[in-house]
Amino acid sequence: MDWSEDPGMPPPAPPVLSVSELNRMARRALESQLPLLWVEGEVSNFMRAASGHWYFSLKDATAQVRCVMFRGRNQFAEFTPANGDHVEIRALPSLYEARGEFQLGAESIRRAGAGRLYEAFVRLKAKLEGEGLFDPAKKRALPRFPRCLGVVTSPQAAALRDVLTALGRRMPGLPVILYPTPVQGSGAGAQIAAAIRAAGTRAECDVLLVCRGGGALEDLWAFNDEAVARAIAASPIPVVSGVGHETDFTLADFAADLRAPTPTAAAELASPVAEEMLRALERHARLLRQHHARRQQADMQRLDYLARRLIHPAQQLRRRQLGIAQLAQRLHGAVRARLTREQLRIAQLGERRTSPRHALQRQQQVLESLGARAARAAESARIGRGLTLARLASSLAHLNPDNVLARGYSIVQQENGAVVHDAATLRAGDGLEIRFHRGAAHARVESAQPE
């Protein structure tokens, strides 16, 4: 029997869930409906388990929530939170089935406000990049052997000690000028920019290091100041940035001519090793000596050549006398040759004057030339007239009525022989003669249809 069809029977009871089933359903519902999201709050009850997992609570003025950040995630965190820290976590809402507790599974953690700072950083970076402030084509090479280094940092900063230690190890005695400035805190960005501009105005050094040690994002924020980036880009002195650690990037790094991961690395990039400098000096000295020796040898060879070319005055006089004698001989020969040519010309003129034969020969040549030109002109005229006659014959052939009839046309004439040009001249009953290319026919008009 089907109880569902019996209206008198009560409906079946709903299924009964176990606690485990309920918690599992609740966890799945939470995880499917709520995505990864950012949550802000104050850290409390922080505990690092022996497994490496972090357990803590996030709270605000009216509520709190349990959180867990497993070891596989927290090993990438930039800091370890402590009770009282104000943080932001990116987490997935879930339910801990064993105790039925609502919790957040943290994927990443950052100090509160870091997201807003990063957004401001990205916006300012895009703006300055659009202006060409970070254009790689504008980056300048560092001098290979600087005579003086400038350092923009705090006198109390560990970065200054790191720079001086590295320079003392690599290049003892290299002059260093400090341009002191606060490197964090309110107004630090403007003071750093002022120190960079002062170094450029004073023009005391060849390379400028802008540096500070590592720290939180807020500690390094002064080096993301727009004024600092613009001062570095406008500096007449090449700038090396060494801010924070290798993973830290600031706008100062993008604006600088060269970015170093740490202050120590900045000092190393800006200074040569003393031994390398000595080896370079020795190499240049050796090249200079070799060049000097080659130049000296070339000069000696030239002196020998010039000495061999020197001639005793008596020998020079004999050479001049010989040259004069040769010129006199050439002049005498030229005069005799000119006299001979003139005598020959006079004889030819006399012969032409006394004999008419030459005149007759010239006239005969002229007549022969004119005859040849007349023959060529007659031949050209004959050819031209032949072409003209051919064109006229072709035109006459096209106009010949027989040729027109041969293309399918016919000539209609009245009985009196008049050619019919217009249907309006015809009347019904008129007799017509129609001529074809071959033969003719007689016809009579039944009706005329003039246009």
UniProtKB/Swiss-Prot annotation:
It comes from Thiobacillus denitrificans (strain ATCC 25259 / T1). Heterooligomer composed of large and small subunits. Keywords: Cytoplasm, Exonuclease, Hydrolase, Nuclease. The gene is xseA. PANTHER family: EXODEOXYRIBONUCLEASE 7 LARGE SUBUNIT. This is Exodeoxyribonuclease 7 large subunit. InterPro entries: Exonuc_VII_L, Exonuc_VII_lsu_C, OB-fold_nuc-bd_dom. Signal peptide: none annotated. Its main location: cytoplasm.
